[in-house]
Structures are given as C-alpha cells and as structure tokens.
Amino acid sequence: MKIINILFCLFLLMLNGCNSNDTNNSQTKSRQKRDLTQKEATQEKPKSKEELLREKLNDNQKTHLDWLKEALGNDGEFNKFLGYDESKIKSALDHIKSELDSCTGDKVENKNTFKQVVQEALKGGIDGFENTASSTCKNS
C-alpha cells in the first residue's frame, strides 16, 4: 500500500510538472506576441507633412523644396507653407524652378536676392505667389 501511495504521489508530481510547463509556454507565447505588437507600434511612426508631400513630388520639386526650406530658414514659416494645398505648393515650386533657372551666368548673385523675395512673398500667403515672387534675373 505504501508503494502505491508513493507511486501515486510521484505520478501527481509529474502531472503537476507537465501542467506548469504548459502554462510557462503559453505565458512565453503571449509575451512574444505582446513584444511583437509593441515593436510594430514603435515602427509605425506617423509621417510628417514634409515626408507626405515629398512622396508626391518629382525630383525637381524635391530639390526646390529643399531650397525653399533653406530660404525660409524658420521652421514655423516652412511648416506654414506645408499646410497649403498640394496643387498650390507644386505650382509654387515650379515657379521657383523657372525663376532660378533664369539666374545663370552673370546673374547668379541674384539667387540670394530671390530668397529674400520669396520670404516676403510667402508672408502674405501662397495665393498670388507667382505674381509677387519674381527674380530680377529675367528683367536684366
């Protein structure tokens, strides 16, 4: 009888050990799932307005967006610019390209003057930008 009791106790201990191992496995799996979801959440950072806009621009427009960012200097002004309608931004960047393309040869120093003109023109908003922001390169 004692042997049966001892064997029965050993059987229960083994059975209990198997159940606790299953619990550890399920806890480990749930931890792995939780870790994966946390990694995915950190990887999916929302894109900035600038990044979203850059995806929709061609290479020339991206180049002139960089030029404009440098010209505005102030992040607040640039962020205000990014808040405008996409089509207006694209037309403004195309206008900047055409004006800068005319500043070649002897007129290269006029590019810096054009930066100041652009800064002042954008203070009044993007509407009418093409009329108010013109370089002196075409006039000379």
From Swiss-Prot:
Q: Where is this region: Disordered?
A: 22-53
Signal peptide residue numbers: 1-17
Task: Give the induction note.
Answer: Weakly induced when grown at 35 degrees Celsius.
Subcellular locations according to the entry: Cell outer membrane
In this record, residues modified by a lipid of the kind S-diacylglycerol cysteine are: 18
Q: What family is reported?
A: Belongs to the Multicopy lipoprotein (Mlp) family.
List the protein's name.
Answer: Lipoprotein MlpD
